[in-house]
């Protein structure tokens, strides 16, 4: 009988209980003798040799675990060498996966034939999965866009020269009020500054603001006291703020229209709300 058959017989009998050999009980007396009814003799005589405990026999060949620790694969002890067991227990998880797929000879004694493991010997591109899974990785890689191609695409964003183009502004000037013409002219002078600063690269058009914060603050202060400004005060503000007389006049006209709109919105809010 070959070693393979011996291992199969051992594997089939691995769940049977462990018994001490029969010659050790040759000098044992009967379990219940009929001479006395009160005294019960133990099945082991005093002159019997000391039998080694079952767990010590089971773990004797391992030489790794303590006899008090139970091991669920104790019956395989006599079929593995100590070096092989230590090498198997010290393997990392990644090394075990590689040896299962690449080195089938180490675990060949667990299987009946090597033909069942031939599918795992051919490792694909992934390094873990077989070659049959390479088609899924190829399709996944083909679907991913190339980042270099996206970077090489030219920037097709429209520059901010549209604010300085008179053809586009001509249509807007017809729709706007005549009071906005001064602001439109002042915004044309700021187009060169926007090109140099690089703010024209943004998609959204920059808000036109020909007046500085200091000028707006002084104009708002004057509008708070006088909604309608006379010519003398208008000339005084234009000299103080470095503006033209027409710019100050247009600003007050726009500010009065804005105030009228705000008052109309406030009236609609308070009349529509029943709490007021």
Curated annotation (Swiss-Prot):
Q: Which GO terms describe its biological process?
A: embryonic skeletal joint morphogenesis; regulation of transcription by RNA polymerase II
Compositionally biased, Polar residues: which spans? 139-149
PANTHER family named in the record: HOMEOBOX PROTEIN HOX-A11-RELATED (PTHR46092), HOMEOBOX PROTEIN HOX-D11 (PTHR46092:SF2)
Q: What is this protein called?
A: Homeobox protein Hox-D11a
Where do the record's region annotations for Disordered lie? 139-207
One GO molecular function term? RNA polymerase II cis-regulatory region sequence-specific DNA binding
InterPro entries with a match to the protein in the record = DUF3528, HD, HD_metazoa, Homeobox_CS, Homeodomain-like_sf
Question: Which keywords accompany this UniProt record?
Answer: Developmental protein, DNA-binding, Homeobox, Nucleus, Transcription, Transcription regulation
| Residue spans binding DNA | 204-263
Cellular component, GO, one term: nucleus
Q: What does this protein do?
A: Sequence-specific transcription factor which is part of a developmental regulatory system that provides cells with specific positional identities on the anterior-posterior axis.
Where in the cell is the protein located?
Nucleus
The entry assigns this protein to a family as follows: Belongs to the Abd-B homeobox family.
């Amino acid at each position: 009988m070959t070693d393979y058959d011996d291992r199969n017989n051992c594997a089939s009998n691995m769940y049977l209980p462990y018994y001490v050999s029969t010659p050790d009980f040759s000098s044992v007396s009967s379990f219940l003798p009929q001479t006395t009814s009160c005294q019960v003799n133990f099945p082991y005589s005093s002159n019997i040799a000391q039998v080694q405990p079952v767990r010590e026999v089971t773990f004797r060949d391992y030489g790794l675990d303590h006899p008090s620790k139970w091991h669920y694969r104790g019956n395989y002890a006599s079929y593995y060498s100590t070096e092989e067991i230590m090498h198997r227990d010290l393997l990392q998880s990644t090394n075990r996966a590689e040896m299962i797929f690449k080195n089938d000879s180490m675990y060949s004694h667990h299987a009946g034939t090597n033909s069942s493991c031939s599918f795992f010997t051919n490792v694909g591109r992934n390094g873990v999965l077989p070659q049959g899974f390479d088609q899924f990785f190829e399709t996944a890689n083909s679907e991913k866009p190339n980042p270099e191609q996206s970077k090489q695409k030219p920037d097709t964003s429209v520059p901010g020269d549209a604010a300085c183009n008179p053809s586009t502004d001509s249509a807007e000037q017809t729709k706007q009020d005549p009071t906005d013409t001064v602001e439109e002219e002042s915004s044309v002078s700021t187009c060169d500054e926007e090109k140099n600063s690089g703010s024209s690269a943004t998609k959204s058009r920059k808000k036109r603001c020909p007046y500085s914060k200091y000028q707006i603050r002084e104009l708002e202060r004057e509008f708070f006291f006088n909604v309608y400004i006379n010519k003398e005060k208008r000339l005084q503000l234009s000299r103080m703020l470095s503006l033209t007389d027409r710019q100050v006049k247009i600003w007050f006209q726009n500010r009065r229209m804005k105030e009228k709109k705000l008052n109309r919105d406030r009236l609609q809010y308070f009349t529509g709300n029943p709490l007021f």
